[in-house]
């Protein structure tokens, strides 16, 4: 009985480790994540960044963004692996469509769209956003707001 319990535990452990490693590999080649930031009454940067599974990214800076206009960049495979694995672990498709409180004013929103190759999910994050989603937003904003490696489309 003890050996059977140990075998069941080992099988479950192996299956859970294996499923987390498959995250990005299970996504269709057309998968992408997009971050859009919305304006506020102050100087909140507004932009849209889209990153494809293969690392190709586009950025469109509008108001108060360090980069104004259209930019492109290719992120490393390691960066993409970490990012898309995190998104898969977050189970975006099961999340609510909005985190907000309409009584709270003048907060910009971070709108995340994830497309896995078949289905897409857009989540508007403005108020009372769970910590794991805030971590994803922080990671996406760091990638978007960096100035290194982005090339203006007009310079291509």
Feature-to-residue mapping (PLM):
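Sec-dependent bacterial lipoprotein signal peptides
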Residues: 1-15
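Short, well-ordered, aromatic-rich surface patches in folded extracellular/luminal domains
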Residues: 5, 17-41, 73, 86, ...
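Post-signal-peptide N-terminal segment of Sec-exported extracytoplasmic proteins
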Residues: 37-65
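Short, mixed charged/polar active-site loops
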Residues: 46-48, 68-70, 120-122
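A short, structured loop/turn motif at beta-sheet edges
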Residues: 51-55, 74-82, 114-120
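A short-motif feature that recognizes glycine-rich, charge-decorated loops
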Residues: 58-95
């Amino acid at each position: 009985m003890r050996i059977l319990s140990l075998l069941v535990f080992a099988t479950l452990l192996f299956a859970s480790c294996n499923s987390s490693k498959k995250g990005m590999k299970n996504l269709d080649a057309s998968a992408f994540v997009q971050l859009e930031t919305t304006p506020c009454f102050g100087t909140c940067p507004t932009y849209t960044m889209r990153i494809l599974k293969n690392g190709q990214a586009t950025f469109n800076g509008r108001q108060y963004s360090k980069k104004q206009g259209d930019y492109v960049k290719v992120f490393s495979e390691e960066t993409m692996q970490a990012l898309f694995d995190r998104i898969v672990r977050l189970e975006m498709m099961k999340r609510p469509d909005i985190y907000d409180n309409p009584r709270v004013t003048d907060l910009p929103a971070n709108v995340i769209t994830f497309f896995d190759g078949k289905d897409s999910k857009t989540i508007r994050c403005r108020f009372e956003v769970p910590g794991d989603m805030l971590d994803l937003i922080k990671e996406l904003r760091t990638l978007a707001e960096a100035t290194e490696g982005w090339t203006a489309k007009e310079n291509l």
